[in-house]
Amino acid sequence: MDVFMKGLSKAKEGVVAAAEKTKQGVAEAAGKTKEGVLYVGSKTKEGVVHGVTTVAEKTKEQVTSVGGAVVTGVTAVAQKTVEGAGNIAAATGFVKKDHSGKSEEGAPQEGILEDMPVDPDNEAYEMPSEEGYQDYEPEA
C-alpha cells in the first residue's frame, strides 16, 4: 500500500509542477504580448506593420513553451490582440486599409474607414463628411 501511495504522491507532484510551468508560460506570453502592443503604440506610421509582426512573433515564441490545450487559448488571445492592434493602426491612419473591402473571412467590412478618401500619392487621409450622422442628445 505504501508503494501505491508513494506513486500517487509522485504523480500529484508531477501534475502540480506541470500546472505551474503552464501557468508561468501563459503569464510570460501575456507579458510579451503586452510588450508588443505597447511597442506598436509607440511606433510611427512606418513602423506599425513591423510592430504588429513583432507582437505576433513574441507571442508565438512564448506559445511554443506552453503545452496542451492552453496553446489554443493563448493563440486565440494572441490572434485577437494582433487583429486589435491592426484595427487600431488602421483607425488612426497609420496603415492603409485593404481596398478590397473584404475581411479575411470574406465578409464585407463595415465602418467609418470605408468612406475615408485616400490619396495614394501622399498617403494623406481625410475625415469623411458628416452626412448621414445624427446629433446625439443624451436623455436626462
UniProtKB/Swiss-Prot annotation:
* Post-translational modification note: Phosphorylated, predominantly on serine residues. Phosphorylated on Tyr-125 upon osmotic stress. Ubiquitinated. The predominant conjugate is the diubiquitinated form.
Segments of this protein annotated with the region Disordered: 97-140
Source domain of life is: Eukaryota
Phosphotyrosine: modified positions: Y125
Query: Could you tell me which Pfam families the record lists for this protein?
Result: Synuclein
Residue numbers carrying Phosphoserine: S129
What Gene3D superfamilies is this protein classified in? Helix hairpin bin
Q: Where is the composition biased (Acidic residues)?
A: 112-140
Outline what the protein does. Answer: Neuronal protein that plays several roles in synaptic activity such as regulation of synaptic vesicle trafficking and subsequent neurotransmitter release. Participates as a monomer in synaptic vesicle exocytosis by enhancing vesicle priming, fusion and dilation of exocytotic fusion pores. Mechanistically, acts by increasing local Ca(2+) release from microdomains which is essential for the enhancement of ATP-induced exocytosis.
Instruction: Report the family membership.
Output: Belongs to the synuclein family.
The protein depicted here goes by the name: Alpha-synuclein
| Organism for this UniProt entry | Ateles geoffroyi
Name of the gene encoding the protein in the UniProt record: SNCA
